[in-house]
Amino acid sequence: MKRSRTISMIGAVCTFGLAVATSAVNAADDNQLSVTVAFGRGLNTQGTPVNNVVIPDTIKLKENGVVNFIVAGFHQIVVYNPGKTDDEVVVPGTGTFIDDTNNQFYSGIVPAGGPGALPITTDPSNARNRVESVSFPGPGTYLVICNVRNHFNGGMFAYVQVH
């Protein structure tokens, strides 16, 4: 009798410990100060729609946290302030870039050249295959898009939820 009670207690303690550890991991997922995000699937893909993704497409972050976007290929990160949604982005009918600056929070490196449309100064250029870190100082849901028109039209956008 005493032995079965001891085994039951050990089982209960183990179950409780596992439940606490699991909830701590889930809570940590929503409360990260630094998150790494793939902005493009990778250099081992062709320059096709397969590469034009943001993984994951919902990013959860603590206030004042940082998202490190690992950019693979010809992409430009643009982040909008909370409140703007993907269906509110003004997309021109032609051209390479969208350039909708309304309610814009951050505009990343232009992949066709250096910052601010400067010509490429090195080969290989730092405008492709890079890491861009973006800080999110306030709460809200931020829209992140690829500013390349065809990429955005193909669904290359994500949301950063800051708590």
Give the location of each predicted region.
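Bacterial N-terminal signal peptides that target proteins for export
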Residues: K2-G11
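Serine/threonine-biased, Pro/acidic-interspersed low-complexity stretches characteristic
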Residues: R3-S4, A21-A28
